[in-house]
Amino acid sequence: LPLATMMVNPKPASAAAATKSSITPDAALTQWKASVVAIDTLLDRWDSLAGGDAIRKELGTANFGTETSPLFQIQKAFKVLRDNDDSISDLVEFTEQSEEFTNALNRADTMAYSANFAGGSGKPTPPKVYTDKAKIEVQDMKRIAKSISSLLVTSP
């Protein structure tokens, strides 16, 4: 009988509570607004960044040093905003746009990561090819971010 109970409820109540997000809706909204600024700053500084890891640091996908990009774990902020009915004017559209944003972020990260290993033996591809592709994805993130921001309700 104890084994059956374990199979039905494998997590104790305290573990289930610990998995809930500790981010408040206000903190999630603040993180989102900072992320929009980070995207603009990244695009403005693009030509001065030194390689794929510098791009990935700004994307929040490779955290080097003491500062963390607001884009780091942005999916958690999206979840908090989705779960807070008062934050979004159109839940379905927000969900679709936030997934599209996350996909573009992942593609940008992949291209920036690939730039770190480009230029090997054989017929090498220059790293700039991959950083240029990453930039296209970040520009797409900016476009999607405008759409997401328009769906957020910022005043009561």
Predicted regions and their residues:
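N-terminal twin-arginine translocation
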Residues: P2-S22
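Alpha-helical segments in soluble extracytoplasmic regions
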Residues: A27-D90, F94-E100, A104-L105
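Domain-wide signal for the mature, well-folded portions of proteins, strongly enriched
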Residues: T5-P12, L42, R56, M141
